[in-house]
Amino acid sequence: MRNRFYLRWIALMLAMGLMTGCAVNPVTGESQLSLISESQEWSLGAEQYVPTQQTQGGQFYLDPELTIYVRDVGRKLAAVSDRPDMPYEFVVLNNGVPNAWALPSGKIAINRGLLVELEDEAQLASVLGHEIVHAAARHSVQRMQTGMIINAGIAGVGMAVANSEWGQMAMGGAAMGAQLALAQYGQSDELESDHYGIRYMVEAGYDPMAAVELQQLFVEMSKGQESNYLTSLFSTHPPSQERVNRNLALARELGSNGYRGRDVFEKRLAFLRSRQPAYDAYDDAIKQIQSENFQNALTNVNKAIKLEPGEAMFYALRGQLLEHLDKPAAAAEDFDKAVSLYPEMFRYRLQRGLNAYGRGDLALAKSDITDANRLVPTAIGYLRLGDIAVRENRRDDAVALYSTAAEAGGSVGEEARRKLAKLSQG
């Protein structure tokens, strides 16, 4: 299947890269291991950018102007970076977790959950500059070369893509992209990204004290671990007082009279901030689901929909709740709505397809799950397509689909292995 082919291709790139030895880090000027060429690095980032966005919530489509603003700030910083020729891209994700990430070749994302924690454009520049360094200094690539990421992908280990009991499993290349985005950086990588990110900020005209303020905020937040959401930020970008101290020393050395951009930032964030009560209600619904208070969760998600009826993720969550409450027909209407609002999102098509399968609409199930798997392959997707193949008397297809699903762990992989064994006996 495609995910296995892609992972073999990555493994082959690594093996071929053994011929290249060492190279100079384009940011630090230091010699480092180089098993992956620049062209391979760029291909990897391009291949994984959209699937990784999808597994992390998809694009924040309600306010495209916000993404344009973030992109413009990012481009200012990229232009003064040590690798200005990289094909940088910047996107805002519809994810309440305060985090940002960078894939190889400068494919960068920032969650709306982090944007609402910021106070001005200079702080945004601090975040983006930091991520630009991670990409420019090839930090993720270095981790791949030491086997810290690629091994997990080749092993076929799935990754949960939603923080709920209904979370599906991304497989193969899609799982590897998420691993790249959410991998924990070491302290040396973080210090390096802080240092050069601040220099990029100053070169682009921003006040470097914004980086100090942001790191101080993260240190304070980490002390209390105010919510599970913060775990993601602090696991991928661990804060420390040492980082605060170093940032402060560098900011004082470079001077702190740069641009802050509070007014323009607040203007650009106005729409998102106005919709925050709706996302708070959605987050409350998630918490209620985790506590198995499903009726309260339904009340909260209904509140979210009333506050922002154009948000697809609200309908998708209500559809999940209605399915749990044994109302599949009503759930189907919500999944239809989610797909109509954001047809590019794999998860909504997958959810609608699984709902259709449960209702016996095999044609819609097959179409939706196939489309979802083209975007982000999932174990549950392969499993249900295998079930459909069995019901359509396509034994060879069923064997291939079950075999792919069987690579996953958990109950889905176990069910696939059981059904595969039954087919083999037949």
Where are these regions (language model features)?
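Peri-catalytic and regulatory segments of divalent metal-dependent proteins
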Residues: 23-165, 182, 199-235, 241, ...
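Register position in tetratricopeptide repeats
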Residues: 290, 324-325, 358-359, 391-392, ...
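C-terminal motif of bacterial Sec signal peptides marking the signal peptidase cleavage site
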Residues: 18-21
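Helix-start (N-cap) detector for alpha-helical repeat units in TPR-like alpha-solenoids
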Residues: 278, 312-313, 346-347, 379-381, ...
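Structural marker of alpha-solenoid helical repeat scaffolds
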Residues: 307, 341, 374-375, 408-409
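Bacterial N-terminal signal peptides that target proteins for export
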Residues: 1-11
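Canonical tetratricopeptide repeat
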Residues: 317, 351, 384-385, 418-419
